[in-house]
């Protein structure tokens, strides 16, 4: 399955890019931040579905909320696994 196409269809790429900050954090930042963390996948699936804010305010220079997304749990899980598999990028 092509998760980048799913990310495009679901509107994720309006605010995210694998390699650079757009409105939200680069997916490579997310991959680095959560690498090896127990429970990271479930935490991020919940965040993709319900929305969230506050994690990346320092790096983004503002408190930018991510809205709840119109995805199923299965779609959110596919997207999160894809994001976590991407090349990790420093977010200093």
Swiss-Prot record:
Q: Name one GO biological process term.
A: photosynthesis
Highest rank taxon of the organism: Bacteria
* Post-translational modification, as annotated: Binds 1 heme c group covalently per subunit.
Instruction: Supply the PROSITE patterns for this chain.
Output: CYTC
The alphabetized UniProt keywords are:
Electron transport, Heme, Iron, Metal-binding, Photosynthesis, Transport
List the Pfam families hit by this protein, alphabetically: Cytochrom_C (PF00034)
Question: What's one GO MF term for it?
Answer: heme binding
Q: Which InterPro entries match?
A: Cyt_c-like_dom (IPR009056), Cyt_c-like_dom_sf (IPR036909), Cyt_c_ID (IPR002324)
Q: Do you know which Gene3D superfamilies this protein is assigned to?
A: Cytochrome c-like domain
Is Protease one of the keywords?
no
**Entry keyword Disulfide bond:** no
- Quick one: which residues bind heme c? 12, 15-16, 66
What does the UniProt function comment say about this protein?
Cytochrome c2 is found mainly in purple, non-sulfur, photosynthetic bacteria where it functions as the electron donor to the oxidized bacteriochlorophyll in the photophosphorylation pathway. However, it may also have a role in the respiratory chain and is found in some non-photosynthetic bacteria.
Which family does the record claim for this protein?
Belongs to the cytochrome c family.
The protein's name: Cytochrome c2
Q: In which organism is this protein found?
A: Rhodocyclus tenuis (Rhodospirillum tenue)
| Taxonomic lineage | Bacteria, Pseudomonadati, Pseudomonadota, Betaproteobacteria, Rhodocyclales
């Amino acid at each position: 399955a092509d998760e980048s196409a799913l990310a495009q269809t679901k509107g994720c790429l309006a605010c995210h890019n694998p390699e650079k900050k757009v409105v939200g954090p680069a997916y490579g930042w997310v991959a680095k931040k959560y690498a090896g963390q127990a429970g990271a996948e479930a935490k991020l699936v919940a965040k993709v579905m319900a929305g969230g804010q506050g994690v990346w305010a320092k790096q983004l220079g503002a408190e930018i909320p991510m809205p709840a997304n119109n995805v199923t749990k299965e779609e959110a899980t596919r997207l999160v696994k894809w994001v976590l598999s991407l090349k990790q990028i420093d977010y200093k």
